[in-house]
């Protein structure tokens, strides 16, 4: 079992899943977010090859337009 925290909420998964697949399956609009893993931004080009990891802290950062 894989256990990690995303935006303060604990998730437990039975199987490995890529960052990309996890975010897509949970309804996030991938075009407009960034993902921070343990305090560092994980580049989108790596989302397919990196998996949600045990005991990691993730934060989703959204882009906000202004003017």
Model-derived segments and their meaning:
Residues 1-66:
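Ubiquitin-like/PB1-type beta-grasp interaction modules and other compact soluble beta-rich domains
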